[in-house]
Amino acid sequence: MVKLEIKNVTKSFYRNEGKQSTLINAIENVNLAVNDGEFVCLVGPSGCGKSTLLNILAGLDNPTKGQVVLNGRPVTGTGPDKIMVFQENALFPWMKVIDNVEFGLKIAKVEKIKRREIAMQYLDMMQLKKFAEAYVYQLSGGMKQRVSIARALVLDPEVLLMDEPFAALDSQTRDLLLVELQLIWAKTNKTIIFVTHNIIESVCLGDRVVVFTNRPGKIKKNIKIDYRRPRLTEDDNLKDFQRQVLYELKSEMVHSRKEKIDLF
């Protein structure tokens, strides 16, 4: 069953160049259907509009043309049905871990005992239960991202949106979190859309890897990753999938450079 539909979405903005303004399309005519419980990774050249699209999906920005439909209803703004996890955590460092995870539930006026129960359930899932009373500033970068994911999941969103959440982490911590995220996804059956510039990461996580063109960002290729889980980054059986994604990205770079050369 389709959970999320992106229908002919274009996002434009004006860029000032001296006394003139130039209309720029960040993304153009993007169409994508994401099934319930599917894990979709978005990759593409820097500046191709992946994060712009994610902001539109979250309701943080509006498309210039087209629409996003979640569970049959147009997305018109933010809400607990679609939660974003960013590269830089948005945790409150002066609060304890448990208070950060409970924060959204408190805003939603969930009864205190119930919200503590839910928060502890997800901290346990993220292997952070024993750090519930620690302060955020006492945690490592990887642990902070786990808290961010737990805080997003406690609200039971329809779609979890992740914008390069592991980009700032060291490779060892990232690889560990890649496995943990797959296990959590299997337990919760959440629909996840994950933006990354890392090919290995995308193939390790995604049911599909959606490759974007250079700006204006359009969908160039959908690559299905039909392989068992949990996946490890070191698994040689994933290398063919990685090569497919790399080929599409490199061919896009070559095509883009040729177009620029042909202009002269």
Task: Give the label of every model feature segment.
Residues I98-K106, R116, K224:
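Short helical segment in ABC ATPase nucleotide-binding domains corresponding to the A-loop/adjacent helical element
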Residues A58:
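Helix-to-loop junction immediately C-terminal to a conserved catalytic motif
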Residues Y135-L139, M143:
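Conserved ABC ATPase signature
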Residues V43-P45:
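The feature captures the beta-strand-to-loop junction immediately N-terminal to the Walker
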Residues V154-E158:
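A short, proline-enriched helix->beta-strand linker immediately N-terminal to the Walker B motif
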